[in-house]
Each structure stands twice: as structure tokens, then as C-alpha cells.
From Swiss-Prot:
Keywords: NADP, Oxidoreductase, Porphyrin biosynthesis
Protein name (Swiss-Prot/TrEMBL): Glutamyl-tRNA reductase
Taxonomic source organism: Chlamydia caviae (strain ATCC VR-813 / DSM 19441 / 03DC25 / GPIC) (Chlamydophila caviae)
Any matching Pfam family: GlutR_N
Complex formation: Homodimer.
Catalysed reactions, semicolon-separated: (S)-4-amino-5-oxopentanoate + tRNA(Glu) + NADP(+) = L-glutamyl-tRNA(Glu) + NADPH + H(+)
Binding site for substrate: 50-53, 102, 107-109, 113
Binding positions for NADP(+) per the UniProt entry: 181-186
Function: Catalyzes the NADPH-dependent reduction of glutamyl-tRNA(Glu) to glutamate 1-semialdehyde (GSA).
Taxonomic lineage from the root: Bacteria, Pseudomonadati, Chlamydiota, Chlamydiia, Chlamydiales
Amino acid sequence: MVLGVVGISYREAALKEREAAINILKDFEANTLFSQRFFGGEGSFVLLLTCHRAEIYYFSKSNHNVQSELLSRISALGARPYCYQGLACFTHLFTVTSGMDSLISGETEIQGQVKRAYIKAKTDRELPFALHFLFQKALKEGKDFRSQVSLSHPVVTIESVVEQTLDLHGKSTKDKLLFIGYSDINRKVANGLSAKGYRNLIFCSRKNISIPYATVARSQLSFREPYDVIFFGSSESAKDFPGLSLENLASISNRVIFDFNVPRTFTLMERPKDIVCLDMDFISEQVQKKLQISKQCTNKEKPFLALAARKQWEVYEKKCSHISSSQLQTSRPKLLIL
């Protein structure tokens, strides 16, 4: 039996390679028969896909070559994936869920992303005990970690990078800002800019929800409207926006566009002259530069997570041993007393 993870993050791969890895991993969701053959009977997987990481957590009873095959597929993209099994897999997911492996150490969004990835997987397909246990305990320990360990407010945030970038491009608090998608990252950036005096914030979402900002209906969305800054932060691609084209985006000169999506909403073959397009690679580079300057240290909390992971791993091993013994007993033929 093999319980493990294979993946890449912003450390091992640029945005282009992460996008390609996401497409490869999504094939397991798109092709049920293929994934069943790949992981074998009673095997399954959970995909954790975020702006900064693409990971597949898997369990397989029969295919002991799963790890090497996954590594080969992702390595073919030119990336250098990491892999962990058993206790190391537990420790990795616990560290990820706590936010201590994030680009911005201690950020809280990852807890929700891990939870949504787990819920999606168990809704879409049957998961084995191993994956249920791994994710449930990671979510529990991640929550406990935040309640027990005092983390200082991040020195660098995505909001601060966005604000500084807008300043560099001559944007003011009077400019008109459009947020496409009511996602975590869009809300966080909007809240940060609002606190800095930006008031002309407009959201466009597929969902009909009540929010503390002005809104524009999707049917009325036009990229020729005088939006000075546009933030793409939904899970949609370019084909979901009928009016999305380079011509329309460039219809407002000096427009700044942030594409927070991975894979990107759109890719440009050449750099446009009249607009500025920035993606998550840009955000990552800026954050890492600022972190190097601030010399933020976060390693001191990791032993806490390693200890929690070992404790839950030992519980998992005991439960697996008990399950195996029970299955063995039920599979033995009963002796007839003559």
C-alpha cells in the first residue's frame, strides 16, 4: 500500500510549468477509467491546485510505481517535482495546510483551499480511508496550529504588492477598479485597497450574492468600459468571456491588468504597448524580493507540525493494522464442528 504526494510549487517551477502540470493532473479527473487503472482497485487521489502549487495526493494498494510514473510525467515538462510518502506525506500536508509552506508564510487562505480540494474529491469519487484520514487530520491540525501558535502579521502581503504596483504605474484612489470573480484573493486585495482609500471598486461575479461593493452583471460586462485596473480572480478562462480580446483590453490606455488565475485567464504572445499585464509569476517574484529584504524567519514553528504529523501517522498505522486484521478475519473460512 502506498500513500503519497507528488507536486510542484512556486519554488520548483515557473507559472508556465505549473500550468502544464495542472493540465496533466486534471486528466485524472477527466478520465475516470484511466485513473482507476492508474491507481488500481480501491486507489484514488485528491488534487490540490492553487496559485502557487499543483499537487496530487494518492493512495494505491497495487501500483507501487505510481510515484515514479507521476514524477516522470511532471519532470517531462522541465520542472523538478517533489515527492513524499508515508510519514513524510503527512508532515508535508500538515505544513502546507498550516500556511507554513506558503509563499507568504502563515497565510490563512490555504486552509480553505485544502478543505475545498478534499470536499471536491470526496464528492466526485469514492476515497479510501487513507485519504480521508490524511486530509481530515491535516485540516484539524492546521486549525489547531493557528490557535496555539502566535504568528506575527505577514511582513509582506499580496495586497501590499498590488498597492505598490499601482503606485508605480501612476494609479490613484480615484481610479475605477474592476474585480472579476468574488474569490478569496480578489476580496483580500479589494479590502486592502479600500483600507488605503480606494473607493471606486466594482465586482463582476457569476454568483448573485450581496457584497459590500458596487457590482456589474456578467451580461453587462464590457472590457471597453473605462476601467483603469482589472483583476481576474475567478476560475474561468478566456472563452467564458465573449468580449475578452487584446483589442478590447487595450481600448483603455495605461490600463493595468492583474491575472491571479492559474492557469492564466489568457496568455499574450507579445507584450502589448498600451497596457500592463501582470500574472502570478510577477506577484511571486515581488513577494520573494520583499521577503529577502525583511529576512522573515519561519522555521521555528515547523517542529510543532512535524510532531503533530508523527502522532497522527502513528494513529493511522494502528488503524490500518486493525482494519487489515479485521479484513483478514472476515475473509477466513469458518470451521465447521462436526
